């Protein structure tokens, strides 16, 4: 078996990045993850087994062979599966602890506000034809780090209720989050938001409660950008109404044509017809916000929303470098353990790397980043002569490609 991951060689460094106030033994017993040894030396060994299976992509049998060679544990594949299934909630606590540790770091603010992007990514088990798991993520745009995570099954819809919010935050969300009750929740928590909306996402009204004609407003817009005041109702009664700013930005003809072609292509693939209103709305970007206009003019709101792309890049890192989309388990509890172990490895690697690009790779006038070949799994590299190592930055993530066919059990210590 060829496992070229330095994660297996640097256990002490991995453990040093765990939250200092997180008691592994106490929390493992509270979560019933480690009540008796039964072939596993101690709690730390159980975590190492989870990281070998989930973080480094070993199979259950390979993990048992590796652990036996290092005298960490003496288990069969089914026994290891049972232990990992019971440990899934505990591994989730470790993920939460790592994220809480990152949240205590000071973050830069934009005009006194903390910018957070909210999004979710789908994960499928082997052989699945639909979403099996959905990872809901809050992402701090100043630090470039994940600040909150919620894992649900495929039926867990994307909405702002999955995460929590604090005063002084500006939450950035795509059009799927443009729901009246979601926006009310963010405002009740004292935070603000900028969310994209579609022509049929919400029922918009004039501030006085009369019907609002969106397409008449779009056609009447003279410049490239503009705004109008609208009202969004979460239900009957004035107390549930939100008065918001609708920011409108007219796309260039080329951008509008590209979006319209995408809509037509998707409709043809599904065997449906495109609503003419969708083709008309494709010419615009529409944002909803409750931020004050005197402090945040329309151009600033549009500029802030453009930072949202960074969470999409974070998902690409999770899937291409951390291999989060290579879920190998079908049993729900084992799949949870695998995902949490992979997230632990990813978050520790992010702490060590700690770098955020300064601009979007797809921004106008910017060269696109060439994607590296997909790797499984990522490694925390310390090879000074390696292809991904900069002598000034010895803690960078290196990508190691693995043979999928086992060859020999490695002699590594973790």
Question: What is the meaning of each model-derived region?
Answer:
Residues 1-57, 65, 74-75, 79-87, ...:
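Single, function-defining residue in the core of a domain
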Residues 62-69:
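Short alpha-helical "recognition helix" segments of helix-turn-helix
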Residues 81-103:
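Short, basic alpha-helical nucleic acid-contact segments in DNA-binding proteins
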């Amino acid at each position: 078996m060829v496992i070229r991951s330095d994660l297996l060689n640097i256990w002490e460094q991995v453990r040093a990045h765990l939250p200092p106030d997180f008691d592994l033994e106490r929390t493992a017993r509270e979560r019933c993850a480690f009540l008796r040894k039964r072939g596993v030396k101690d709690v730390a060994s159980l975590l190492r087994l989870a990281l070998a299976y989930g973080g480094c992509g070993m199979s259950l049998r390979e993990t048992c062979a590796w652990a036996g060679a290092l005298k960490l544990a003496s288990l069969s594949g089914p026994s290891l599966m049972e232990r990992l299934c019971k440990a899934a909630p505990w591994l989730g606590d470790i993920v939460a602890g790592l994220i809480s540790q990152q949240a205590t770091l000071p973050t830069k603010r934009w005009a006194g506000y903390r910018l957070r992007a909210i999004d979710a990514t789908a994960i499928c088990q082997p052989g699945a034809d639909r979403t099996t798991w959905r990872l809901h993520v809050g992402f701090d745009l100043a630090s470039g780090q994940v600040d909150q995570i919620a894992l649900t099954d495929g039926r867990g819809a994307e909405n702002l209720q999955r995460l929590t919010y604090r005063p002084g935050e500006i939450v950035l969300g795509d059009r799927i989050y443009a729901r009246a009750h979601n926006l009310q929740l963010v405002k009740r928590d004292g935070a603000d938001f900028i969310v994209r909306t579609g022509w049929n996402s919400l029922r918009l009204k004039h501030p006085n409660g009369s019907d609002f004609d969106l397409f008449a407003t779009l056609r009447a817009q003279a410049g490239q950008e503009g705004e109008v005041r609208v009202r969004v109702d979460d239900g009957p009664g004035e107390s549930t109404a939100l008065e918001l700013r609708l920011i409108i930005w007219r796309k260039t003809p080329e951008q509008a044509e590209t979006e319209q072609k995408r809509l037509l292509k998707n409709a043809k693939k599904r065997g449906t017809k495109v609503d003419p209103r969708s083709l008309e709305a494709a010419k615009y970007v529409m944002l909803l916000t409750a931020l004050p206009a005197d402090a945040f003019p329309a151009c600033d709101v549009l500029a802030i929303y453009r930072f949202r792309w960074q969470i999409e890049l974070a998902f690409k890192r999770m899937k291409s470098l951390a291999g989060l989309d290579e879920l190998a388990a079908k049993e729900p509890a084992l799949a949870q353990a695998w995902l949490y172990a992979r997230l632990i490895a990813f978050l520790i690697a992010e702490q060590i790397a700690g770098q955020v690009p300064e601009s979007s790779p797809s921004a106008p006038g910017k060269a696109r980043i060439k994607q590296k070949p997909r790797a499984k799994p990522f490694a925390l590299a310390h090879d000074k002569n390696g292809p991904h190592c900069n002598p000034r930055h010895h803690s960078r993530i290196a990508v190691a490609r693995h043979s999928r066919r086992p060859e020999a059990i490695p002699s590594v210590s973790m």
